[in-house]
Amino acid sequence: MITGTQLRKARELLGWKSSDLAKRAKVSRAAIVRAEASSGDPMITIAQAGMLVDTLCAAGIEFTVGGEPSVKLKRKDQP
């Protein structure tokens, strides 16, 4: 499961507003704002989390593990 902090950082890396992510992921903006307000468990459904992760990954975000959970933007030449 992603954290609210990861979600916010991923969105910011892409230069998206919460409304941009909401539209692309088909998740309400209120759910995104609520999720990002939490540093831990994002307080959204598993289905919503899945749609957000899928959307962010398709846009080039890579969620990293090990130590603190984080995110990074994949380089264009990476598979």
Predicted region positions:
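Short glycine/serine/threonine/alanine-rich loop segments
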Residues: 16, 27, 61
